[in-house]
Swiss-Prot record:
Stretches the record annotates as Disordered: 598-617, 794-817
Subcellular location: Cell inner membrane
Any single Gene Ontology cellular-component annotation: plasma membrane
Listed name of the protein: Probable inorganic carbon transporter subunit DabA
Keywords: Cell inner membrane, Cell membrane, Membrane, Metal-binding, Transport, Zinc
Binding site for Zn(2+): 301, 303, 491, 506
């Protein structure tokens, strides 16, 4: 029976909305696993997702019990929420009831032969250079390539030669769908796309990027995926259509009410503590400042980990810190020195507009040549090693002859990781990396240098330089009072042998370190022409202000400054003082961080704390080098004066903003439609990875295996894992470190300004209306009164508190907090 291809395509596109995109490990991006459900209320969405993916939508009773015993859920708040639903039992009784209800729900899913066979071929086709023997005919597309090799798969019955299978994708759909009315096609597609949401999410991501090398060479689409899966299901006797009992109800929700109540009470308790602390800080901080010009100002990413180091830097002396999206407003593709690889270095919701290359500075040509010689030697050695390991004739002799060497190296990496790290540092001192002799190509190159594949121009036009510099200062509300030194500080992690390293790097840079972006913006702002153009636009940068770039190592809290040591742009004594204070801040921040990492480091030993973080950064067996963004709970948009001196426990995204310098609301609009949305993606990924790690996370790192250099699976096969590993979320088997709360956005701005932005951007408004996030406004035109947004529109006024309570939740003895 011929089928209408346009109808099939439309039904597949509709069904694919239920599957969120999954980025490859190299550019891991945090994203809401229920991204396709955000147009629905949260409670309804998690119910639908639970039926499709089998995952929970709310924290389990063990998590609620930990929060209750730690005092994180206010008793009065919980009692009020329960009373609104006519529930009068004691919280302990309700926790026991939820325990009983949860018993037996975590049974492992039954093994599906269809999934096992299909994932084997998906891994072979989508391999990105890991396999020594790649799947043949991949250039013909997934269905055609699979059809040629399927006869050799003994798990597929009745296929002796390719001609036993439909010849084309269209014929495959016709063969399977002829028994079903058109009205059932979309539920069938939903059923099969959501059976393996990790693999289909990756295919969805890759198929929408036809310009990527792997997709161009080996094309695949969800249509081809469904053609293979439906053909396999037909051959293996698996269900084609979902059971009618699995179909989703049209309206309403029958989700258990208790978890919803407890979650809302927990979220309100956190919100109340945070707002009380902010109010108390506002009352004790004098308006205005007579501190004068600071010694230095440092701009950090809004990342929650920046809150800790910013606080400790400010305690060292006359320093100011600001928060800005970690790609520093420059939508670029970065090409590191000595490689043809190009990496996206801007948020996942932004397309690169420029290609920035690293080229040796003229005074450092000799240093670059020495580095090139060493790099060629390393490359040749790596190629030889790969050949010996993969060559059939040489591999056995190679293993016999080199076993002692590799065994000793493995023992050293395991038993003395810090020692090897110091050797690496000594090598870096002898042969510094490209950052020491290269400079970014910020000037626009001739059109002939534009990339032939994507057309991105190399460098930036003069107008773009001014635009990015002005946007950075405008969004932060920073138009005057520039220090002699301003440091744009990107961030990146340091961790070996970690498939999820990109998840610890800068999310605003697409899972890459933010140092390159910081160097670009610093170079732009140092140009005389840019500063002159900024003066004409009302941003006066003093003649003695120098812009530097740096990178915050979030694993060790070390901040490296990118400075030409032979010709530093800052006076040596000022540079030494800044570095000394940054080192002191590192020690204080490390002391704070190690308290949450279950270490044996004693309190009050900063040097030992730094050594412990450095060990974790070097240890290839360390499953938890750092916590990443675990604990994130709030996104604060406002001047640093709102939070300066307040210990936010590394749980808040901090974006600098001054409503008084943003008359038309453009800066706030950019923040709410950009960084705030990315913050919601990060928060929901941590939330769902915590509430149901089996469905939305990636399990234990100990049992993960990398497949095809694109993702991880648990054990030796199965679905691609889409979320975060347990070690990024839990302190141990019983206690969570990440508190699964939906993100609270707090914005200091006039209420009508925020409301106007929501009216113009329905997608952002839906996140609040459907309770994927909560919104509170601190209205400066109403004496900084807190007003809370009501889903669907309108505002709740919040009465002023009688006294402040601590933002940090109290912890009971013996329970990690």
């Amino acid at each position: 029976m011929p089928i209408d291809r346009s109808v099939v395509r439309a039904r597949i596109e509709n069904a694919a909305e239920y599957v969120g995109p999954l980025w490859p490990l190299r550019t891991f991006n945090a994203a809401n696993p229920l991204l396709g459900f955000e147009d629905q209320p949260f409670d309804r969405a998690v119910q639908k997702a639970g039926q499709l993916f089998g995952g929970r939508g709310y924290p389990g009773p063990t998590v609620f019990r930990q929060a209750w015993e730690n005092g994180e859920i206010d008793a009065d708040v919980l009692t009020r929420h329960l009373a609104e639903h006519g529930i009068t039992e004691r919280p302990e009784v309700l926790l026991d009831r939820m325990d009983a209800d949860a018993a037996g729900r975590d049974a492992a899913p039954a093994d599906q032969p269809l999934d096992r066979v299909l994932t084997k071929w998906l891994a072979a086709f989508l391999d990105q250079g890991q396999a020594a023997w790649p799947m043949p005919n991949r250039e013909d597309g997934f269905y055609a390539a699979w059809r040629t090799v399927a006869p050799y798969d003994g798990d597929i019955p009745g296929v002796g030669r390719p001609s036993d299978l439909p010849g084309t994708v269209v014929e495959a759909f016709e063969a399977v769908l002829e028994s079903y009315p058109e009205a059932r096609w979309e539920p069938i597609f939903v059923h099969h796309l959501t059976a393996l949401p990790g693999w289909t999410g990756f295919i969805k991501w890759r198929s929408r990027r036809a310009d990527t090398a792997w997709q161009a060479a080996h094309p695949i689409s969800l249509t081809e995926y469904l053609a293979v899966r439906l053909t396999l299901a037909d051959r293996m006797g698996a269900a084609i259509a979902p059971d009618r009992t699995d179909e989703l109800p049209a309206n309403g929700t029958d989700q258990p009410v208790l978890p919803r109540i407890w979650l809302r009470a927990w979220e309100e308790s956190y919100r109340t503590r945070l707002l009380d602390d902010l109010r108390q800080t506002q009352q004790t901080t004098p308006s205005g400042s007579d501190a004068g010009r600071p010694d230095a100002q440092l701009v950090f990413c809004i990342d929650t980990r920046s809150e800790v180091i910013r606080r400790h830097i400010e305690q060292q002396g006359p320093y100011e810190t600001h928060g800005y999206a970690g790609f520093f407003g420059v939508p670029m593709q970065h090409q590191p020195y000595g490689t043809e690889e190009r990496v996206k270095s801007c948020p996942p919701i932004v397309d690169p507009k420029h290609r920035i290359m690293e080229r040796p500075a003229e005074p450092h040509r000799a240093q670059a040549e020495r580095y090139d010689w060493w790099a060629r030697l390393q490359k040749a050695g790596a190629a030889l090693l790969k050949t010996l390991k993969k060559n059939v004739a040489a591999v056995f002799g190679f293993v016999e002859g080199s076993g002692g060497f590799f065994g000793a190296a493995m023992a050293a990496r395991t038993l003395a990781p810090s020692g090897l790290s110091r050797l690496d540092e000594a090598l870096d001192d002898w042969l510094p990396g490209p950052a020491s002799f290269c400079e970014p190509t910020v000037d626009r190159a001739p059109p002939a240098d534009a990339d032939a594949e994507d057309g991105l121009p190399v460098g930036l036009a003069d107008e773009a330089k001014v635009l990015y510099a002005e946007a950075a200062f405008r969004l932060m509300g920073w138009t005057d009072t520039f220090a002699p030194v301003v440091v744009f500080t990107g961030h990146g992690s340091q961790t070996p042998n970690n498939p999820y390293k990109a998840s610890l790097d800068c999310g605003a840079c697409a899972g890459n370190p933010g140092g390159p972006n910081a160097r670009v913006l610093a170079a732009i702002c140092n140009e005389d022409a840019v500063q002159e153009a900024l003066r004409e636009r009302g941003i006066a940068i003093p003649d003695d202000t120098v812009f530097l770039a740096g990178q915050h190592n979030t694993t060790t809290d070390e901040i490296a400054l990118f400075v030409d040591e032979d010709d530093p742009p800052v006076a040596p004594d000022a540079l030494d003082r800044l570095r000394r204070d940054l080192h002191a801040a590192q020690a204080d921040a490390a002391t704070e961080r190690v308290r949450t990492l279950n270490t044996s480091v004693d309190e009050g030993r900063p040097a030992a704390a730094v050594r412990e973080t450095e060990r974790r950064a070097a240890d290839w067996a360390e499953t938890r080098p750092e916590w990443g963004l675990a604990g994130n709970a709030a996104f604060i948009v406002g001047p640093r004066a709102l939070t300066r001196g307040l210990d936010l426990d590394g749980r808040c995204f901090l974006h600098s903003y001054d409503w008084a310098t943003d008359d038309d609301g453009t800066a706030l609009e950019n923040i709410m439609t950009g960084p705030l949305v990315v913050g919601e993606w990060i928060n929901t990924q941590y939330y769902f990875s915590t509430v149901d790690n089996a469905a939305y996370g990636s399990g234990s790192k100990v049992t993960q295996n990398v497949v095809g250099k694109l993702g991880v699976v648990q054990g030796n096969g199965g679905d691609l894992m889409s979320g975060l590993p347990l070690q990024s979320l839990k302190a141990d088997d019983e206690h969570v470190h990440h508190r699964p709360l939906r993100l609270m956005a707090l914005i200091q701005a006039p209420t009508d300004r925020v409301e106007a932005i929501l009216d113009r951007h329905a997608a952002v408004a839906h996140l609040f209306d459907h309770e994927w996030m909560h919104l509170t406004v601190m209205d400066p035109e109403q004496d900084d009164a807190f007003v809370r947004y009501k889903p669907g529109g309108g505002w709740h006024a919040r009465p002023a508190p009688d006294a402040s309570t601590a933002t940090k939740a109290p912890a009971s003895a013996g329970v990690p907090s």
